[in-house]
Regions:
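Bacterial N-terminal signal peptides that target proteins for export
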Residues: 1-9
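Cyclophilin-like peptidyl-prolyl cis-trans isomerases
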Residues: 3, 19-283
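Bacterial N-terminal signal peptides
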Residues: 8-17
Length: 283
């Protein structure tokens, strides 16, 4: 299961302001608390990584992640393929990239339907579609105006493979994802639309970037001394006193917009949606 290698922005923002926000977790003002059932706690040899799962984007893959996590399947598995500025891959009990669980493979969830209550905030309007953030996930989507001419009053959207994004690895078939997943440490547009996005690292991206890297000549294969997931749990399965609490800035809020403008100022003409990391509190 190796990874192979229109409306104006202002008008869209005005439309979005009229919709309710259906977020993953409790929301208070500018901040949203990630629900414990959607907070994936991955302890590694290099530290802790917290991933927000996004069921609105890939419900079947989220169900698989939860099932395997609750079984203890991921505990002790190595990050067998790590390529700097690209991704770190794990989830194979064989540690080779060819293994998986005994559960059946999953049908790809490369796109999803987005409603006006999704809480999407546009950030970039270049090329085809609006690019912005929903929850903590970077996505590209059709504008809200398209919802008025669809039977379900929704529009199509697709997750983007930016730094921190969690995706499912697969073999050649688009419907062959099983247990392996990867955490992005860089941007790779070639994966967009061909692999399932299911979440994003909201804390610990520095930990992912510190994992032992593989040999470039061996396509990132790390070998027997690879770093491992010592334990993977859902926050909801942890004793309440031990649960990490993460609050993410709501897309379109003041702290979110400040982060966008800071990234835009730093990157200048090269700015794109992958430069935006939603601000986070807690841990």
């Amino acid at each position: 299961m190796k990874i192979k290698s229109v409306m104006t922005l202002a008008a869209a923002t005005a439309l979005l302001a009229g919709g309710a926000m259906a977020q993953s977790g409790a929301q208070s003002g500018d901040w949203r608390t990630v629900s414990p059932e959607n907070l994936w706690v991955i302890d590694t040899a290099k530290g802790r990584v917290l991933v927000e799962l996004e069921p609105r984007v890939a419900p079947n893959h989220i169900e698989r992640i939860r099932t395997l996590t609750n079984q203890g399947f991921y505990d002790g598995l190595k990050f067998h393929r790590v390529i700097p500025n690209f991704m770190a891959q794990t989830g194979d009990p064989q540690g080779t990239g060819a293994g998986g669980s005994e559960l059946p493979d999953l049908k790809g969830e490369f796109t999803f339907r987005r409603g006006r209550d999704s809480g999407f905030a546009p950030v970039e309007n270049s090329g085809a579609g609006l690019r912005g953030v929903m929850g903590s996930i970077p996505i590209v989507t059709q504008p809200d105006a398209q919802m008025f001419v669809t039977a379900d009053f929704k529009t199509s959207a697709q997750g983007l493979f930016c730094p921190g994004v969690a995706g499912m690895a697969r073999a050649g078939s688009p419907d062959s994802a099983n247990s392996q997943f990867f955490l992005m440490t860089g941007q790779n547009d070639n994966l967009n639309g061909g692999y399932t996005v299911f979440g994003r690292v909201v804390q610990g991206l520095d930990v992912v970037r510190a994992l032992k890297a593989g040999d470039e000549a061996q396509d990132g294969a790390v070998g027997p001394d690879a770093d491992a997931m010592t334990r993977a749990r859902l926050a909801s399965a942890m004793p309440e006193a031990e649960r990490p609490t993460i609050r993410v800035a709501v897309p379109g809020s003041a702290p979110f917009n400040a982060a966008v403008e800071a990234a835009r100022a730093e990157k200048g003409a090269s700015f794109n949606i992958c430069d935006v990391q939603p601000p986070v509190q807690g841990g």
